[in-house]
């Protein structure tokens, strides 16, 4: 069984990389791939770079070259639900684009023509992640929609515009929908696990810098427990 884990930034992948046995790293088109083993499971760790284009390029390379059975997209996100706080973890039920608008041609908001409006996370991976959560103390975990766009959400007006578009929105970030779209096209099951480094619209740039490391620790802790359970 081969599992891929994708994070955008060094802070989001460094803990897991340091835990891989027999690790080997190669860089293709500025995308960093590290292969190794964790608790008997073959892992491909991808540092994708920030944003949807980087995520799409790197995920395509990942799925074509390494052919993983499952994909986990991890890292940080901005919280969108009123019950959430910095450090909490969100598990995706589905993932959507929040900066795609072809509604003039009768598509749903966020829908890329010819593709689904929402990319559903794999039920098995969601279930395994929920089981793994029970082993974590002091971390609140929620499950819902994660939305993606190529912008950092520190404009309160834009936050409200996006919130009004999606009824069950829990987090926003800059890569997950691109990862999910590529996984859909390759028919590869995925789930997104994101820890909150900020709450969207509330001095986001300040809290992001302060809490990115904490978010990376929380998301990685959960991913490691998922890997132990998945094989």
From Swiss-Prot:
The cellular component terms of Gene Ontology attached to this UniProt record, alphabetical and capped at eight, are:
cytosol
- The residues listed in the UniProt record as binding substrate, with positions renumbered to this chain, are 78, 153, 174-175
Mind listing the UniProt keywords for this protein, alphabetically? Answer: Amino-acid biosynthesis, Hydrolase, Methionine biosynthesis
Q: Which top-rank group of organisms is this from? A: Bacteria
Q: Name one Pfam family in it.
A: PNP_UDP_1
What biological-process GO terms show up in the record? Answer: L-methionine salvage from methylthioadenosine; L-methionine salvage from S-adenosylmethionine; nucleoside catabolic process
Is the keyword Amino-acid biosynthesis assigned to this protein?
yes
Which residue pairs form cystines in this protein?
none
- Main role? Catalyzes the irreversible cleavage of the glycosidic bond in both 5'-methylthioadenosine (MTA) and S-adenosylhomocysteine (SAH/AdoHcy) to adenine and the corresponding thioribose, 5'-methylthioribose and S-ribosylhomocysteine, respectively. Also cleaves 5'-deoxyadenosine, a toxic by-product of radical S-adenosylmethionine (SAM) enzymes, into 5-deoxyribose and adenine.
By what name is this protein known?
5'-methylthioadenosine/S-adenosylhomocysteine nucleosidase
Species of origin: Bacillus subtilis (strain 168)
């Amino acid at each position: 069984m081969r599992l891929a884990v994708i994070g955008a930034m060094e802070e989001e992948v460094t803990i897991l990389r340091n835990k891989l046995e027999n690790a080997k790293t190669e860089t293709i088109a500025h995308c960093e791939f590290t292969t190794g083993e964790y608790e008997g499971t073959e892992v491909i760790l991808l540092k994708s770079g920030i944003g949807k284009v980087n995520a799409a390029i790197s995920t395509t390379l990942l799925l074509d070259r390494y052919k993983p059975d499952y994909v986990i997209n991890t890292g940080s996100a901005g919280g969108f639900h009123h019950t959430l706080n910095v450090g909490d973890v969100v598990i995706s039920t589905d993932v959507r684009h929040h900066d795609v608008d072809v509604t003039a041609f009768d598509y749903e908001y966020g829908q890329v023509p010819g593709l689904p409006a929402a990319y559903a996370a794999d039920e098995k991976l969601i279930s395994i992640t929920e089981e793994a959560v029970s082993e974590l103390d002091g971390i609140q975990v929620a499950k819902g929609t994660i939305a993606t766009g190529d912008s950092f959400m520190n404009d309160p007006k834009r936050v409200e515009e996006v919130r009004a578009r999606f009824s069950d929105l829990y987090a926003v970030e800059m890569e997950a929908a691109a990862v999910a779209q590529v996984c859909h096209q390759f028919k590869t099951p995925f789930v997104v696990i994101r820890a909150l480094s900020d709450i969207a619209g509330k001095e986001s740039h300040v809290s992001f810098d302060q809490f990115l490391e904490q978010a990376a620790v929380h998301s990685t802790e959960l991913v490691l427990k998922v890997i132990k359970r998945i094989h």
